[in-house]
Amino acid sequence: MKESAASVAVRPQLREVFERFPADAHRTIEDEIHEMMKCYAFDDAIFLAELHYETDKSNNSESLLLYADCLYRANKKEECYGLLSSVKLSGARLFYLLARVSYDLNKIDDCRGALFEHDDGVIRKDILEEPRVASHANLLHAQMLCDESYMDLALESCQKSLDENILLWSAIITYLRFGGHDLAHTFEKHHRKSNGLYLDSPASSLKSETPSPNVPGPSSSSAASTAEPSRLESSVRRSTRGTIASANRETRNTTSNITPRQSTPGSTPSRINPTAPRKSSRISEMTTRRTESSVTGSRSSLFTEPERPHTRATHSSRNRANAALNSDTENSNASNTRTRSGIASVTRGSSSSQRTNPVRTSIRIADAAAAANKTAKTLSQRRRNEKQPLVSRNSNLARSLSGSTNSVASTASERPSEDEVSQINPPLPSVASSLNNDEPMDIVDGVYDPEYKKLFDVYQHIALIEESISTYNWRSADALFAKLDRDIILNTSMVRLQLGRACFEQSEYRECRNILDDLHKRRKWKVDGTELLSTSMWHLQDTHALSALSQILTTESRERPQSWCAAGNCFSLQRQHTQAIECMERAIQLDKRFAYAYTLLGHELIVQDELDKAAGSFRSALLLSPRDYRAWYGLGLVHLKKEQNLTALTNIQKAVNINPTNRAMLCTLSQIEQQRGQIDTALVLIDRALTLNPLDVACRFNRSRLLFEANRNEECLVELDKLKASSPDEAFIFHLLARVHRRMGNTHLALLNYSWAAELDPRGEQNITDSNVINREEYEDDEYGSPV
């Protein structure tokens, strides 16, 4: 009786609760479930969806999709997979959801069965009939093909995905990562398709520029084939398609009767992190000494100052030495090159005196300032004067690019001017029209509302910048950055990250650190880009800042691979390479598709002389990003350490074909050619590297060493005298100068230069040579005791 009375007392309360529930005659159970998912009440949504699926027999496919969707969003992928695989499916979204969850669970056979009707690689007709689902299905197919190393087919699937939905950013990243190009033509097709116009131009060629690991590289016997891979790469990009502006003008004349409509992008998968490489000094046995310079005209000033005028740098006594350094290797057009403004006060770690050198600012910021201030004057014509030191003061971090020479890699180098680099990387066809057209890259008026149209214009512009960065075409990237509005650069994280990546790729580590550090401070919750920030600090040997960054990331974002890459960089800078390897492996465990972690792991394994594991790590990076030139370069260095020079030459040539603007790789190629006895070819490669930056001290030192190996003593002496005037605190220069004088019979000058080298490097930290050099160098009086 007591229980009955209690139940009677409760019933009115429940009735009152249900009576307070808002009644809406048009509201369905699907609306209630979606409302719960919007409020992140996934367990409640799953309960209602399961109840709805078990009781609704009229529209079982829709209720099944809703139930499976709730499970997937709640990260209950095993339950979602079990549900979908236990029933007969119908409909594009159900098949795609089963394929997606199977791929996430690494059930590739089930993924293929859901995606393809037959085992022929053709996506189901039901999926293809729904363009929004087809775009995601094609992208998933591309990822599967990439895992199976079918790069050309993966590129084609990415193109199909973009044809269906151009707003899939992950599809654009994947498309460029597989070697795609000419995004402007893809946007043009989207514009015409959006307006119901037939695209009568043929589809763009989908030929991949990715070199196959089974295809041998270009012959190294000829200097032309080795020294000019950039022409081959740039010729692939050339096309004769019309510009975006011309296509828009055509479509504006034919859209007067078209009903305005707005396409809505589908749910985009999480953005794939672009590969962010560590530069070549990561695996070199000697790193350059970083200068503590304050670049007043750097890119970072864009984020703190409204605009800055271009100033002419003051010249010091060092400029005369640098002018002498340039006299014999600069191109005839070098006097007309565009240069950058800014003054840097450079402090050498090994010298107590301070020297003021004019330092250039990036063309991107110079052009951006010119765009913001249309009345700005033309940039003054002058030379870059910032040099790079040869070696690091830390002997344990000093790693040479070659195991058999005492050469030096340049890592703290500056980017060539616009005219110098135009011969190497001409503007891409996809952005050629935007370089000469001040009008925004807009789409047809009347089809999209103004806000959508504005966002689409910015999206298209950012996509073209991504294409320029992915193809290492800095001239096009500079022009596109200059055309962006200042507010977009200041307030868009993706644009800042792209700007930081561009600085990082060109070894402008100080500017990269300033840009990405400012981004991290403004948006502390964002982790993307911190792997580049930590690597920039590694190059600058900023131990305290790197330690603080890694501490913050590993505390607040332990489940992100970028955090453990930063921790690995921190341990590597402190020469704790075993702990660094553990951190990189942890990053790979968190994200098995993070190619940058594989690259860093390979570099650390090279330092530990675990060459087979390092090669496997680089190959894993190439599976994920076949155009990652750092992975090709690292693989070449592994073979170089194994003294497999021909295989190393082939791999490094592939890296140069992908990125022809990397001077360190050209120096390494020249060292391999020198070991093979091809001195002339090696000199051609060094001269090509010097055309990118005539003031690169490391490249010039390598050129002097090659002249010494070729017994061209007079030319070597002239080159070293110029280097001595430009870099009077580098022990390597005086050491090689002493060897030249000894060979020429100038014993007193040889002893004098040996003495200066010992004063600059009393503990021999810079004296990193192998046994071959020692046996060949010292003390053979019959070779060095008489003039040659």
From Swiss-Prot:
Q: Which InterPro entries match?
A: TPR-like_helical_dom_sf, TPR_rpt
The disulfide bonds in this chain are: none
Q: What SMART domains does the record tag this protein with?
A: TPR
Pfam families tied to this protein: ANAPC3, TPR_16, TPR_8
Pathway in which the depicted protein is active: Protein modification; protein ubiquitination
| Tissues with expression | Expressed in the ventral nerve cord.
State the compartments where it is located: Nucleus
Q: Deletion: any effect?
A: RNAi-mediated knockdown results in defective metaphase to anaphase transition (Mat phenotype) and embryos that arrest at the one-cell stage.
Which GO terms fall under biological process for this protein? anaphase-promoting complex-dependent catabolic process; asymmetric cell division; cell division; cortical granule exocytosis; meiotic cell cycle; metaphase/anaphase transition of mitotic cell cycle; polarity specification of anterior/posterior axis; protein ubiquitination
Outcome recorded upon mutating residue 580 to T? In ax72; mat phenotype
Ranges for the region named Disordered are 198-436
The terms describing its cellular component in GO are: anaphase-promoting complex; cytoplasm
Q: TPR repeats located where?
A: 561-594, 596-628, 629-662, 664-696, 731-764
Could you tell me where the Low complexity compositional bias lies?
217-229, 366-378
Effect annotated for changing residue 140 to F: In ax227; mat phenotype
Biased composition regions of type Polar residues, renumbered to the chain: 241-273, 293-303, 319-360, 391-414
The record lists the effect of residue 105 to F as: In ax161; mat phenotype
User: Keywords, A to Z?
Assistant: Cell cycle, Cell division, Developmental protein, Meiosis, Mitosis, Nucleus, Repeat, TPR repeat, Ubl conjugation pathway
Family per record: Belongs to the APC3/CDC27 family.
* Subunit (UniProt): The APC/C complex is probably composed of at least 12 subunits: apc-2, apc-10, apc-11, cdc-26, emb-1, emb-27, emb-30, mat-1, mat-2, mat-3, such-1 and gfi-3.
State its role. Answer: Probable component of the anaphase promoting complex/cyclosome (APC/C), a cell cycle-regulated E3 ubiquitin ligase that controls progression through mitosis and the G1 phase of the cell cycle. The APC/C complex acts by mediating ubiquitination and subsequent degradation of target proteins. Developmental role in early embryogenesis and the metaphase to anaphase transition in oocyte and spermatocyte meiosis and mitosis in germ cells. Required for embryonic anterior-posterior axis formation.
What name does the UniProt record give this protein?
Cell division cycle protein 27 homolog
Query: Which organism is this protein's natural source?
Result: Caenorhabditis elegans
